[in-house]
Amino acid sequence: MFVPYVIERTSRGERSYDIYSRLLKDRIVMLSGEINDEVASSVVAQLLFLEAEDPDKDIYLYINSPGGVVTSGFSIYDTMNYIKPAVSTICIGQAASMGAFLLSCGEKGKRYALPNARIMIHQPLGGAQGQATDIEITTKEILRIKATLNKILAENSGQKLSKIEKDTDRDFYMSAQEAVKYGLIDKVLEKSLTE
């Protein structure tokens, strides 16, 4: 992936940054692509760094993700709750599966999507092979994770758990406007939050 650089001029001269480091100075964290352990570790490290820099200032988590590994997503979710700063979530492009879950986990009142963003929720994906007892153990764990995800989505959206269970049984797509009505986000943004 090509990462652009920006040049900043200061009284002490010029300094070049990769674009993500420059955005981090403005407390912006980008979550792009599949959520795996490597991506989650990077996001968690940035959240912890920004908390250390200023624990009273909001952090902006921009999400454009098709989802990914549940445990990786949970590490981001737990860190969002662990740190003191409010984490505002903004969907750009898409937030599907674990991406949609994390979008809904932003600070209430500060969960956004751009007008043409797409949000999709569904049940966790998994598989098992091997001995019957191993398959049974894996099945129980997937069902436990599914129940946890549904409970948190219900809390975040204000929907009844039974509705979340029904809607996540299959892929459930929403426009940004529909996600507001559903309760996953609070507002569709037409203009930047910094204006």
Curated annotation (Swiss-Prot):
Active site residues according to the UniProt entry: S97, H122
A GO BP entry: protein quality control for misfolded or incompletely synthesized proteins
Pfam families: CLP_protease
Keyword Cytoplasm: yes
Keywords: Cytoplasm, Hydrolase, Protease, Serine protease
EC code: 3.4.21.92
MF term (GO), any: ATPase binding
Subcellular location: Cytoplasm
InterPro entries xrefs: ClpP (IPR001907), ClpP/crotonase-like_dom_sf (IPR029045), ClpP/TepA (IPR023562), ClpP_His_AS (IPR033135), ClpP_Ser_AS (IPR018215)
Catalytic activity: Hydrolysis of proteins to small peptides in the presence of ATP and magnesium. alpha-casein is the usual test substrate. In the absence of ATP, only oligopeptides shorter than five residues are hydrolyzed (such as succinyl-Leu-Tyr-|-NHMec, and Leu-Tyr-Leu-|-Tyr-Trp, in which cleavage of the -Tyr-|-Leu- and -Tyr-|-Trp bonds also occurs)
PANTHER family registered for this protein in UniProt: ATP-DEPENDENT CLP PROTEASE PROTEOLYTIC SUBUNIT (PTHR10381:SF70)
UniProt-listed HAMAP family: ClpP
Family: Belongs to the peptidase S14 family.
Record-given protein name: ATP-dependent Clp protease proteolytic subunit
Source organism of the structure: Campylobacter hominis (strain ATCC BAA-381 / DSM 21671 / CCUG 45161 / LMG 19568 / NCTC 13146 / CH001A)
